[in-house]
Amino acid sequence: MCGLQDGVCIVRESEAEYDVIVVGAGSAGCVLANRLTGAGLRVLLLEAGGVDRNHFFHVPAGFTRMLGRPANDWNHVSEPERSLNDRSLVHFKGKVLGGSSSVNGLLYVRGHRADYDHWRQLGLEGWDWDSVLPYFRKSENFVDGGDAVHGSGGALHVQRPVHRYCAPLMDRIVTASVEYGLPAIDDYNTPDPEGLAHAQSTMRGRWRCSTADAFLRPALGRSNLELRTGADVQGLILKDGRAAGVRYRLGAKLLEARSREVVLSAGALKSPHILELSGIGDGERLRASGIQVVHHLPGVGENLMDHVAVPLAFRVQGIHSANQDVHGWRMAREILKFYLFGAGVLTATPGMVTGFARIRPEAASADLQLMSRPFTSDPGAKNFGPEKLPGLSIAVCPCRPRSRGRIHADSPDPARMPKFVMNFLSDEEDQFLVVEGIKLARRIAEQPALKPHIKAELSPGSAAATDAAILEYARQVAYSAYHAAGSCRMGVDDLAVVDARLRVRGLQGLRVVDTSVLPTMVSGNTNAPTIMIAEKAADMIIEDLHA
């Protein structure tokens, strides 16, 4: 059946509606598709990107080949960041089955107990640490075995390094951190972690374990799941205060699908855009952008946040790093090592040693994340590829950044990307933590376990000797950790977009389930918390629809 709207033929699907339409087959959407269909609900899963057929999606280090490709990456670019010397930053976001879990750095980091207990203090019942821990454990299959913290038997495989690539250098970083005075830990996913440890990664043996691998593929054979790739959602169908379905483009066709409930899982840079394109947002702002107001909800697109990362680079000596393995004939050797033994540089992740430190002694929990990797980038190389001489990088990230940005549509045209800014390092506390974090990383490099192997500090270098100089360096080189969150904030106040059950306030049949609902930032990488949120949301949706 074809109806006309603004001169465009809209093809309406069969009258039989779905129970749930999930927009986005990413870290959250794949989990929802699995859990909801497992409970007998009929689900339509829409993904704007394609299938993750390319082999590089599944090789751990292969993400470096996939980022930035228009077919697989949204390639969001911010407006000039005033506090970063007016630089515009690229924000990589997966546009493929699995979403960013197919192109991220694979780190499995939950954050601190205090992050979630703070949400409960904000009035969000059921989001404290003790309430969300079962959902972390439910999804996880920790290779070392389950315990009170880790799960076993879940769909998502999580493991420590198997062959421990560049182990001598990585071990020395951990030892040096203890020599400096950080606690010695083995697991940074305990409720209150402080100290550095070898990474836990979403891998199954040698391969990446994305949510497409873990959750979606096992559900694809179910008759009550329909998956459509290349389906770019244009907006929601709203009727009498309820979300009745979605309108999406599939090739040259504009299609409509109807459902009892719609769930936006398109991520913190897409979910608020879809809401605003549908007339849900701040009324004055929508009218200024030429969008008809359907539901005034002023918090949409506000509270945007992300982890800012600032790198240090060292030239190392007398010890092996990844730099030497990725040039010339050595790269061919590494490919053989990967396929024959599941070892070598292709198993490496951006944070092979990671963990947390407490900069302010009075802080309730650690306030800085450090991520170390055994290579340094060549600024003159394509895609900032590794240098040829041995190197070590340490990135510092404030755990709970206070800087806030915003993202908004400036046109009713769905093809026009929204405008956004993170306002990185606009807050003095974030500036303080970055400066002190760089000084901390330098002190770790000075410890006996590591100092003999540090030939030189490449950046920021000796010229950055004062706090002001370090901060200026940070403004020049800081980048996004690609953890955008908060733009459809969960809360109980007038600027909240969703309530504690992730329902869009003031509307029926509409939820948001992705990082955009975070009221405040979690301490660390966001993939694991996103999966947890989806697990919890699935239970709530099933309960409500079966009521």
Q: What spans do the regions from the language model cover?
A:
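Short, hydrophobic/aliphatic alpha-helical segments
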Residues: 16, 76-92, 256-259, 468-475, ...
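FAD-dependent oxidoreductase catalytic-site/capping-region signature
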Residues: 2-18, 133, 139-192, 197-199, ...
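N-terminal glycine-rich phosphate/pyrophosphate-binding loop and immediately adjacent elements
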Residues: 2-138, 294-297, 307-309, 313-316
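Glycine-rich loop(s) and the adjacent beta-strand/alpha-helix scaffold that form part
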Residues: 35-38, 42, 50-52, 236, ...
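Conserved redox-cofactor binding core of oxidoreductases
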Residues: 76, 120-243, 247-249, 311-334
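Loop/turn elements at helix/coil->beta-strand transitions in domains of secreted/extracellular proteins
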Residues: 39-43, 128-129, 223-226, 260, ...
